[in-house]
Amino acid sequence: MSYYNSYYGGLGYGSGGYGGLGYGYGCGCGSFRRLGYGCGFGGYGGFGYGSGYGGFSSGSGYGGFGYGYRRPLSYGGYGFSTFY
């Protein structure tokens, strides 16, 4: 199910990742200032729904946004209803 409030704890609706300074639903590990729902790992300023590695495409694995996509990584970006 969705991984809200998971892992080490960042800011946001359900951030997961250590010290994600982003806001939105489910910031990833090391997210610095991304906004949107579900930023991914180490994406600086990535915005959108469920961003992956730190870009903004449309529903990509790494670096795409599109809420509800799946990413089998603990730090790899979880969106609106992603699966681990």
Swiss-Prot record:
Top-rank lineage group of the source organism: Eukaryota
Keywords associated with the record: Keratin, Repeat
InterPro entries linked to this entry: KRTAP_type8/19/20/21/22, KRTAP_type_19
Induction: Expression in skin and hair follicle is regulated by HOXC13 and by GATA3.
Regions crossing the membrane: none
Region (24 X 2 AA repeats of G-[YCGS]), start-end ranges: 9-78
Any one Gene Ontology cellular component term annotated for this protein: intermediate filament
Expression tissues: Strong expression in narrowly defined pattern restricted to the lower and middle cortical regions of the hair shaft in both developing and cycling hair. During hair follicle regression (catagen), expression levels decrease until expression is no longer detectable in follicles at resting stage (telogen).
PANTHER family: KERATIN-ASSOCIATED PROTEIN 19-3-RELATED (PTHR38140), KERATIN-ASSOCIATED PROTEIN 19-4-RELATED (PTHR38140:SF5)
Function: In the hair cortex, hair keratin intermediate filaments are embedded in an interfilamentous matrix, consisting of hair keratin-associated proteins (KRTAP), which are essential for the formation of a rigid and resistant hair shaft through their extensive disulfide bond cross-linking with abundant cysteine residues of hair keratins. The matrix proteins include the high-sulfur and high-glycine-tyrosine keratins.
Subunit structure: Interacts with hair keratins.
Entry similarity comment: Belongs to the KRTAP type 19 family.
Protein name: Keratin-associated protein 19-4
Provenance organism: Mus musculus (Mouse)
Taxonomic lineage: Eukaryota, Metazoa, Chordata, Craniata, Vertebrata
